[in-house]
């Protein structure tokens, strides 16, 4: 029985320039890859069947074009190139003739094995989680095509080879393109097992829970008749660079983002919300708003007032004329971001007395306490605070919902978690989730923000009220105002140091932060002893420190928070790596040598530290440092990857200004899926991490956000971006995720360089406000 791909609606794709001419008449889909015709692939050669789908991931056309479905959403990270190449590798497809189709929403079909089995594009789990799944998909498709050729030529299948979309029988010098075989394909009811030859394909450390069974049988005992997947030494596509499929349409204007989606007959809507999050409308004077030509509806929603009209200009003008009295929300109106941070810091200082949860430990607690009580041990500590941060995707939120007469509906939304959005919206619409078809356009940046529903919830409320197709648009001001931010966090790290041996014997982390997990997914929060691992997992140390303990506090405050790229790891590593340098300075030890002395059991960690020291010419540049310039080092193991980074920092004492001129980064992510994508991810992460470390913070006073747009929420400018040098340290280890790695070290690396210049570390993120208040003389650490 043939399994077909999810149906792709007939759509018209149009450039933004063309949209201006034909607005209101189009929708858009995501399909990448302009493919040339191939010799031998003709409609005449296979007149009866136009295409065949061996499984839900692959469709082979009679003209030789191969469509590959990508389960992950393209956020700019390269998923629509890296993931389809896993399929194409095992299929031996001609990459130039591959088109990429975006999957719809289905955990059952497209769920990520390393993300609770959900269709989840985040947490550096995309390439790792889908690696086996997609290789098997490609191998199944190749199996079908090879069996078809074997039947056609009456030869054993094991005598056949495949190369770039062609099946070959060298003994008889016969060949057939995949397209030529389509008409004869018979898809079996079941496929043989596939096994990997002694290859680890999943990371050992997985904070989403125990790693699930691999989807491929392992070489220790493959089933009889099982077929081996390719060994990495034979890869033709994986590990090699290739032009990204999504770049040409982005350059020529054909790419379809959520903001580009147009559905015939749709109305536009915007929602006015209160000055404090969570306020509901109490009384609405919409008389002036309804006078604006083109306005169809003004609706009170549970969380705001929606204005619906024929075009966005009318809607925006009408919304500005609304007069709304809002119901008080004393809980949220009492929130003050600075006060909350101070409370978190106090909790960290008194964590044990404040019922902190022991989230993780290495060694017995009695042994840890005993080491800290030893008279020959020096106790070093580091405390830090980190403000709320806006994820700041360049594309604000939008969503379209189109209801149908049979009670079903379709939705178009840029999201990192389509099935979660589907569930929220379907619940509001009063239909089953499978009655809401999800279309997933390109996303102009996710960074964790699009893990949570936003504009689609607005659209669902409006569509349920009026029964018409609606597109909801958020302005930049809406996006910032209604955003659940990266959590504020405080951390205290203590180290027991045996000075005579220059060794760290034990570490204690205490972390206090609010939780996104507790708010939206309490079942997972409870599974982690009512803690959020995204907040504290950064405290897990790969250094040779035998005794470690992490205590977590999750005080629930009234502001909504959401995961952000780097989660709490970027914040906790700021404290941890600053402390490591602080200890090295106390001991008059070189920061590189001190780390290497604590990485004897981590050859991968030691390798990236040595590599980045060589890249940055650490010994010479450190010796030449002075005059307000220094190098700073930070190292982080995370999600089966190892990263070391050196920053060259300049500090102007007279103006109290800090800048970063150069960054060197060595990264080991095990097997590399595509080198250029990994480097681009690291560069982007470093830039974002630099912006967050230096200047980004959200301030809330009495529940009111103190920012409205980028003029009062500053971010790093192009002129402030340093030279960035990334080197991949490839090993035979399992593939690791990449997306978050660049953010994790840049903050502490800058801080460590700053301390080498001034003798003191900064103890808050972002750094610029601390610099403005810093005394110009006298160390504080």
UniProtKB/Swiss-Prot annotation:
Cross-referenced InterPro entries: Ald_Oxase/Xan_DH_a/b, Ald_Oxase/Xan_DH_a/b_sf, AldOxase/xan_DH_MoCoBD1, AldOxase/xan_DH_MoCoBD2, AldOxase/xan_DH_Mopterin-bd_sf, N-heterocyclic_Hydroxylase, OxRdtase_Mopterin-bd_su_IorB, TAT_signal
SMART domains with a match to the protein in the record: Ald_Xan_dh_C
Catalytic activity as recorded in UniProt: isoquinoline + A + H2O = isoquinolin-1(2H)-one + AH2
A Pfam cross-reference name: MoCoBD_2
Lineage start: Bacteria, Pseudomonadati, Pseudomonadota, Alphaproteobacteria, Caulobacterales
Keyword terms: Oxidoreductase
GO MF entry, a single one: isoquinoline 1-oxidoreductase activity
Name of the gene: iorB
Complex formation: Heterodimer of an alpha chain and a beta chain.
Name of the featured protein: Isoquinoline 1-oxidoreductase subunit beta
Highest taxon, organism lineage: Bacteria
EC numbers on record: 1.3.99.16
